[in-house]
């Protein structure tokens, strides 16, 4: 895992808790928000483990049903296929849990925490300007109508490009990767398209 990717994920989970106005936040307030984000991730991992356990049990039950209840080869095959799909989903959820100890270790590094706070601060202090850039770059959409997670992904990327001197392509790629994890199925494509329009806009002097 890359430390800055961890910082971006923590920032994404944190900025949803910030007030929408640009009132000054004390550093200790930002720290509290970030701690809440870590706790949110802990809860997600616990839920993933519980869900994976349930899916494995359902998969096992379907295999047993295929042996005892299937009336023909076709129905047996369908039950086994469902069991395989459930097992794959469970394995993917377990993958998240396996990565979590490394995530927490990195999240406790000062450099990760510092960059998380830089990101949160940039979005909070420049919220109005960032939102104006995004409104101009959206086609047939309004920012307030987007899913909160998508709007915040876009805000983070713009903050990195405009205020934190992160190369445009890096900011876009990282936002797309987070969208694959947190956004809807096609969300990452939408995020990519909007941010490419943003880069053209902010390149104009």
Swiss-Prot record:
Span-the-membrane segments of this chain are: none
Known Gene3D superfamilies for this protein?
A: NusB-like
Write down the SUPFAM superfamilies for this protein, in alphabetical order.
NusB-like
Q: Which Pfam families match?
A: NusB (PF01029)
Its Gene Ontology cellular component terms are: cytosol
Q: Name one GO biological process term.
A: transcription antitermination
Which top-level group of life is the source organism from? Bacteria
Name the UniProt key words of this record, in alphabetical order. RNA-binding, Transcription, Transcription antitermination, Transcription regulation
The molecular function terms in GO held by this entry are: RNA binding
> Main role?
Involved in transcription antitermination. Required for transcription of ribosomal RNA (rRNA) genes. Binds specifically to the boxA antiterminator sequence of the ribosomal RNA (rrn) operons.
Q: Which family does it belong to?
A: Belongs to the NusB family.
This chain belongs to the protein called Transcription antitermination protein NusB
Q: What organism does the record attribute this protein to?
A: Acaryochloris marina (strain MBIC 11017)
């Amino acid at each position: 895992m890359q430390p800055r990717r961890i910082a971006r994920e923590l920032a994404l989970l944190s900025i949803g808790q910030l007030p929408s106005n640009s009132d000054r936040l004390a550093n200790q307030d930002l720290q509290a928000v970030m701690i809440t984000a870590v706790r949110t991730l802990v809860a997600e991992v616990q839920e993933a483990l519980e869900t994976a356990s349930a899916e494995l049990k359902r998969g096992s039950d379907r295999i047993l049903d295929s042996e005892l209840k299937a009336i023909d080869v076709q129905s047996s095959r369908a039950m086994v296929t469902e069991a395989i799909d459930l097992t794959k989903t469970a394995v993917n959820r377990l993958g998240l849990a396996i990565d979590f100890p490394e995530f927490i270790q990195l999240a406790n590094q000062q450099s990760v925490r510092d960059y998380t706070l830089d990101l949160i601060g940039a979005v909070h202090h420049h919220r109005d300007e960032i939102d104006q850039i995004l409104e101009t770059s959206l086609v047939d959409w309004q920012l307030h109508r987007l899913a909160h997670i998508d709007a915040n992904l876009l805000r983070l990327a713009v903050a990195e490009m405009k205020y934190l001197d992160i190369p445009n392509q890096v900011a876009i790629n990282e936002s797309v990767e987070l969208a694959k994890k947190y956004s809807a199925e096609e969300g990452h494509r939408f995020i990519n398209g909007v941010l490419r329009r943003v880069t053209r806009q902010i390149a104009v002097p």
